[in-house]
């Protein structure tokens, strides 16, 4: 039994082709169970189609075969793309022993890949007579069939068929065959012989030992789709189908997808490959086209090649057919809308139309090429009363006289009796046959009354057979060279029941003396090729070269006429071509080199306005006239030339005057040019002398706007330091008061003082910071108030009462709402957008460098690393220094390149800090590992309260390509949209049930502990008055009162209560609490009180408003009123006197216990309290979100260590609040160049973070 199995595999190996290159492909049919169009030629049709065929591109339909039919032409078929149908046949067996695979791309009755139906003698009563020989199919003999990819099996009403029920069809079906149905009828007239004992488990296709079924699926080891045996090493390659002889994809019996030169592949090699080195698409020399299940170097004839590498019969949308010079056809994409084409039957809007009728024949008027087919049925000329279609008239068929090509087939089974031929198609040259009638015929003529064909221009039948039968009066069928029309060996002419050739010759219906006796009908116009010469469409014995009119010349056996102006010659040629300059002699005149009917007289040649005058001499040659008149040429002489006219004296005078004027103008122009030349030489000499003596520098204007910001120089006596807020490597920050000389004003300020013995570089850096801060003018960027040039330089800035934003969100984690977070994001983005507009790169944006002026107003600060770009700069390259690694963009770490887009990266990290309530980015990861981590694609995780909308904005900010990051103006728009509907984008648990946003903080309460901090004037109120900013000046009497002023002050009484005094002056009415303020409150305390608190305010103490009358020049321009993402109020409130002036109603004083909860800001979207669920966030390595309360202050964090080469600072007891003025997020690995400040500072803790590296050390 094993020996027999190996013998079967040896037979299969012998049948395996060496590659797809020598595979013979043929077309299938599509007749299903219909009777053949010509039963007498049906077997011949099958023989022509399948003789030597190995792959059937279509269906293999074997129907209506007689019992004695010889079917040996089927024995080479190995693969069928569609289905196999064996029906109504009387043969005993069908030799398909080599058929391995049925792909089922088309299915019989939409379900079956193999159908065997009604193969037996039709017997009355279904019982054969005793001893009678019964015909019909006995055995399938599909011994090599081991794969059906799609479709089931239908075997019915074949009473002589045996062994169909012994086949293990499960082994034949592919594992992914969803239509694996088997409907098998086993009713037989007689018993069948059993399978051979050599067949394992009695699975066979016939009774002999060679008909045993080869199992290639059910016997396989686990995981094998197909195999050659039961061992795990017998598995076939995954691209194999029908079995294999080895494990490689070149050992397959058939390919599951595509056969590439004997190797099974999932895809054919692409025609174009991409070169990653040159970033170009290159032609692939190994590229192949897809043709069925094969990969071919070029598409077969009559198929169209596409740019995507496929062979198709119809071009895709927006493509057009193009025929190359070598005759190959391809689909080419239209550069503009494709030209209109004519569609035939079976295409587009005529897809369901059966025949050409009077209703659709006008679709083909003027068409030279029809994409589709043409069919003429009896209904075409009989009409259809049901659809009100009139009969087609013979004269209407003349629309096809211009037709030259049909891409489908031509089928004619009815034709008008008044037309003895098909001469309406006399210019038809090609029938391509891309679509065939019944899947077999490209030309079918049957049952017609014509006498000859008349297709005199037909030169090609691209595919399919020609069927001409049952035309009782048709002659000249055998005089056509059909073999010259066919393009592949499977094409042939099938003819029967036409008029006998002897009768045609007897009636004189013979060819004109044509070349080789080939013609389409009688007469000289029906020759396929002429034996002598061709004049137009007519064959002639000779051309009219020497006699006859019109005279002709010969070119490539064509008789072509001479020009009409050529003079006919006697006994010699008249011309050498068809043009007027190719005549031997002219019939009338010669205007060299052309023969003309008359000489040109006043004729204007092409593209000329000058007429030409010529006359004919004695020899008939045209000569130019002595006078060439251009206008007023009415007087002509006897030769037809213009007569000579005497010049008028007026003309001479005019010419002289014009000449003199022209000479004067030329002289003036020359004089001016000479003078200017001398001036230029003198100017050049003077400039050279000045440059040589270095008296004047050359001008190189940049076009940049001048920076008109003012630097305010303050005296040390005007400043009073109150307490230390923080200390850094280069100086200390104090809380202080600025008391301008000569004024009764106290302004709370922050004073940054350099340490003693600081390096010159440190002095330069703090002056650079002063230069940057003095030039900004935005409500969201901290401004410089002045500079004090003492022995240690001091910078004076606004005092932000709420400290830095990082400590603020950490301290009030449970009291912040979604609207607060999104409003801060909007304000920071607006500040950074302003810095981008003024070409300032911050380089150090982080939550620690954003100060809180009020709970609703934050400002960007710390410009120690900021750099102002010049007018022609787009980026800044740093040369060293401390940098915040975990906040920096990837291109800013090793290349030291900083742009506005690198600030966008830092902005994304800052937003992440806010959304995690102050968590540390990349917590627990050393700073040196950050670049590698970012290059590998790791980013900070999504904060728990963020929706995907907010997080995706962060992710866009962290794109490697800086050009892919959003601009700040885009970030302003995005977060402004989110701030209008905050709870949709930031989800904080129990936000609606929590307390309102806090007013003060630990840092703010520490500022109020000093008595000197009461009764202060905000710096912006002192410097920037804003009259008429909100509304026009009210007219006298409007509202019944004049303007009054008011401002806010805050103190603490002895009982620790916070008392707010808000008092109006007598000149100004109370203002609406809904009126927006650009500063959103005072610098000392926000005047935007809650309505509940506002109702309790009573009488307010008065204060001298004289400080508010001081005006100073300021280079900034107030921006339009903005609501930072909130909805602005629709009403227009009275205008405040100054920008950050709080607006309240006059109320009695109100004493509050503890911190005062504020109301929702003016114009807020939702009136609701805010809180955050106090749940503990889970830790992690990259960007771990820990409990922000576990962080403590920024200074006490034990993770931040002293850098190399510097002594660690002595620990200090943690203060009650986190000053965070000494930034601990930076590290300079080589601090020697920057000086060595003392390791400790009296009363102020300092720290440096080792996670942040210096730029002067390679990362």
Curated annotation (Swiss-Prot):
One of its GO terms (biological process) is positive regulation of transcription by RNA polymerase I. Pfam families: Furin-like, GF_recep_IV, PK_Tyr_Ser-Thr, Recep_L_domain, TM_ErbB1. It is found in: Cell membrane; Cell projection, Ruffle membrane; Early endosome; Cytoplasm, Perinuclear region. The chain crosses the membrane at residues 654-674. Residues 1-22 form the signal peptide. Residues 675-688 are annotated as: Required for interaction with KPNB1 and EEA1. The lineage of its organism: Eukaryota, Metazoa, Chordata, Craniata, Vertebrata. This is Receptor tyrosine-protein kinase erbB-2. Protein tyrosine kinase that is part of several cell surface receptor complexes, but that apparently needs a coreceptor for ligand binding. Essential component of a neuregulin-receptor complex, although neuregulins do not interact with it alone. GP30 is a potential ligand for this receptor. Regulates outgrowth and stabilization of peripheral microtubules (MTs). Upon ERBB2 activation, the MEMO1-RHOA-DIAPH1 signaling pathway elicits the phosphorylation and thus the inhibition of GSK3B at cell membrane. In the nucleus is involved in transcriptional regulation. Associates with the 5'-TCAAATTC-3' sequence in the PTGS2/COX-2 promoter and activates its transcription. Implicated in transcriptional activation of CDKN1A; the function involves STAT3 and SRC. Involved in the transcription of rRNA genes by RNA Pol I and enhances protein synthesis and cell growth. Residues 1237-1247 have a biased composition (Polar residues). Residues 23-653 are extracellular. The modification Phosphothreonine is found at residues 182, 1165.
């Amino acid at each position: 039994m094993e020996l027999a199995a190996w013998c079967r595999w040896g037979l299969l190996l012998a049948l395996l082709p060496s590659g797809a290159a020598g595979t013979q492909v043929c077309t299938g049919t599509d007749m299903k169970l219909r009777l053949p169009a010509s039963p007498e030629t049906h077997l011949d049709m099958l023989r022509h189609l399948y003789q030597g065929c190995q792959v059937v591109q279509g269906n293999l339909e074997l129907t209506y075969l007689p019992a004695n039919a010889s079917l040996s032409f089927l024995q080479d078929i190995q693969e069928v793309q569609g289905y196999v149908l064996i029906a109504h046949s009387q043969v005993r067996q069908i030799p398909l022993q080599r058929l391995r695979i049925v792909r089922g791309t088309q299915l019989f009755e939409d379900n079956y890949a193999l159908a065997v139906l009604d193969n037996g003698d039709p017997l009355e009563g279904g019982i054969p007579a005793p001893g009678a020989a019964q015909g019909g199919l006995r055995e399938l003999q599909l011994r090599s069939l081991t794969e059906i990819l799609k479709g089931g099996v239908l075997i019915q009403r074949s009473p002589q068929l045996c062994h169909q029920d012994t086949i293990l069809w499960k082994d034949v079906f592919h594992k992914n065959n969803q239509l694996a149905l088997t409907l098998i009828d086993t009713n037989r007239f007689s018993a069948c012989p059993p399978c051979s004992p050599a067949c394992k488990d009695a699975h066979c296709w016939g009774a002999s030992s060679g008909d045993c079924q080869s199992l290639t699926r059910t016997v396989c080891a686990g995981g094998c789709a197909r195999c050659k045996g039961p061992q795990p090493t017998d598995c076939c390659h995954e691209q194999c189908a029908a079995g294999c002889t080895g494990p490689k994809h070149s050992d397959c019996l058939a390919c599951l997808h595509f056969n590439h030169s004997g190797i099974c592949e999932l895809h054919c090699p692409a025609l174009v490959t991409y070169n990653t080195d040159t970033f170009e698409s290159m032609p692939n020399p190994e590229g192949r086209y897809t043709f069925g299940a094969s990969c071919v170097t070029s598409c077969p004839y009559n198929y169209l090649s596409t740019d995507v590498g496929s062979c198709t019969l119809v071009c895709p949308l927006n493509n057009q057919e193009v025929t190359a010079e070598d005759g190959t056809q391809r689909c080419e994409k239209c550069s503009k809308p494709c030209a209109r084409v004519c569609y035939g039957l079976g295409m587009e809007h005529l897809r369901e139309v059966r025949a050409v009728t009077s209703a659709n024949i006008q679709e083909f008027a003027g068409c030279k090429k029809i994409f589709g087919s043409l069919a003429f049925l009896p209904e075409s000329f009989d009409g259809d009363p049901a659809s009100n279609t009139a009969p087609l008239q013979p004269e209407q068929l003349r629309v096809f006289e211009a037709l030259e090509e049909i891409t489908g087939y031509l089928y004619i089974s009815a034709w008008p009796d008044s037309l003895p031929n098909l001469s309406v198609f006399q210019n038809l040259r090609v029938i391509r046959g891309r679509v065939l009638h019944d899947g077999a015929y490209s030309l079918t003529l049957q049952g017609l009354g014509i006498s000859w064909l008349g297709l005199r221009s037909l030169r090609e039948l691209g595919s399919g057979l020609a069927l001409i039968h049952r035309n009782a009066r048709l002659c000249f069928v055998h005089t056509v060279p059909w073999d010259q029309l066919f393009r592949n060996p499977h094409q042939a002419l099938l003819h029967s029941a036409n008029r006998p050739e002897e009768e045609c010759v007897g009636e004189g219906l013979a060819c004109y003396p044509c070349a080789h006796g080939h013609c389409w009908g009688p007469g000289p116009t029906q020759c396929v090729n002429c034996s002598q010469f061709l004049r137009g469409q007519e064959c002639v014995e000779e051309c009219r070269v020497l006699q006859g009119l019109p005279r002709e010349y010969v070119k490539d056996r064509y008789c072509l006429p001479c020009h009409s102006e050529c003079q006919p010659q006697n006994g010699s040629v008249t011309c050498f071509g068809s043009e007027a300059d190719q005549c031997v002699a002219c019939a009338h005149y010669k205007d060299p080199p052309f023969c003309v009917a008359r000489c040109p007289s006043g004729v204007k040649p092409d593209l000329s306005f000058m007429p030409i005058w010529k006359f004919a001499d004695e020899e008939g040659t045209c000569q130019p006239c002595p006078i060439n008149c251009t206008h007023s040429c009415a007087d002509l002489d006897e030769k037809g030339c213009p007569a000579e006219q005497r010049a008028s004296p007026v003309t001479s005078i005019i010419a002289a005057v014009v000449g003199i004027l022209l000479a004067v103008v030329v002289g003036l122009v020359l004089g001016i040019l000479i003078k200017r030349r001398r001036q230029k030489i003198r100017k050049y000499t003077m400039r050279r002398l000045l440059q040589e003596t270095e008296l004047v520098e050359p001008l190189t204007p940049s076009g940049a706007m001048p920076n008109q910001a003012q630097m305010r120089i303050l005296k040390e006596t005007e400043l009073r330091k109150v307490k230390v807020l923080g200390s850094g490597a280069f100086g200390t920050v104090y809380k202080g008061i600025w008391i301008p000389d000569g004024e009764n004003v106290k302004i709370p300020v922050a004073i940054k003082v350099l340490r003693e013995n600081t390096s010159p570089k440190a002095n330069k850096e703090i002056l650079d910071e002063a230069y940057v801060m003095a030039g900004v003018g935005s409500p969201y960027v901290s401004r410089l108030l002045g500079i004090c040039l003492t022995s240690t330089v001091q910078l004076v800035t606004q005092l932000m009462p709420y400290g830095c934003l990082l400590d603020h969100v950490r301290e009030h984690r449970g009291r912040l709402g979604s609207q607060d977070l999104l409003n801060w994001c909007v304000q920071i983005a607006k500040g950074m957008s302003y810095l981008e507009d003024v070409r300032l790169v911050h380089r150090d944006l982080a939550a620690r460098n954003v100060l809180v002026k009020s709970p609703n107003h934050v400002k960007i600060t710390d410009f120690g690393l900021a750099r102002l770009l010049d007018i022609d700069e787009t980026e800044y390259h740093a040369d060293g220094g401390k940098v915040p690694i975990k906040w920096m963009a990837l291109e800013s770490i090793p290349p030291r390149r900083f742009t506005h887009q690198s600030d966008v990266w830092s902005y994304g990290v800052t937003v992440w800090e806010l959304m995690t309530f102050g968590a540390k980015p990349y917590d627990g990861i050393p700073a040196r590992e950050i670049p590698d981590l970012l290059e590998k694609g790791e980013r900070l995780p999504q904060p728990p309260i963020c929706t995907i909308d907010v997080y995706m904005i962060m992710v866009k900010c962290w794109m490697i390509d800086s050009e892919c990051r959003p601009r700040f103006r885009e970030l302003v728009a995005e977060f402004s949209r989110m701030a209008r509907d905050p709870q949709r984008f930031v989800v904080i648990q129990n936000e609606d049930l929590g307390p309102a946003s806090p007013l003060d903080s630990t840092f703010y309460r520490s500022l109020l502990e000093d008595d000197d901090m009461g009764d202060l004037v905000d710096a912006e109120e002192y410097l920037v008055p804003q009259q008429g900013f909100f509304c026009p000046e009210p007219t006298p009497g409007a509202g019944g009162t004049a303007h009054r002023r008011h401002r806010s002050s805050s103190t603490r009484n002895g009982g620790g209560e916070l008392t707010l005094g808000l008092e109006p002056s007598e000149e100004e009415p109370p203002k609406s609490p809904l009126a927006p303020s650009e500063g959103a409150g005072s610098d000392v305390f926000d005047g935007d009180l809650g309505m509940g608190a506002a109702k309790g305010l009573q009488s307010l103490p008065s204060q001298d408003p004289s400080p508010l009358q001081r005006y100073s020049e300021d280079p900034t321009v107030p921006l339009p009123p903005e609501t930072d993402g909130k909805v602005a109020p629709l009403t227009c409130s009275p205008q405040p006197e100054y920008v950050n002036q709080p607006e309240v109603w006059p109320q009695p004083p109100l004493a509050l216990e503890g911190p005062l909860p504020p109301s929702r800001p003016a114009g807020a979207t939702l009136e609701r309290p805010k809180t955050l669920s106090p749940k503990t966030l889970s830790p992690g390595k990259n960007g771990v979100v820990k409990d922000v309360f576990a962080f403590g202050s920024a200074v006490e964090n034990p993770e931040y260590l002293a850098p190399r080469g510097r002594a660690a600072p002595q620990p200090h007891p943690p203060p009650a609040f986190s000053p965070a003025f000494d930034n601990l997020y930076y590290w300079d690995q080589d601090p020697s160049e920057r000086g060595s400040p003392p390791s400790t500072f009296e009363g102020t803790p300092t720290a440096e973070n080792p996670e942040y590296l210096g730029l002067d050390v390679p990362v």
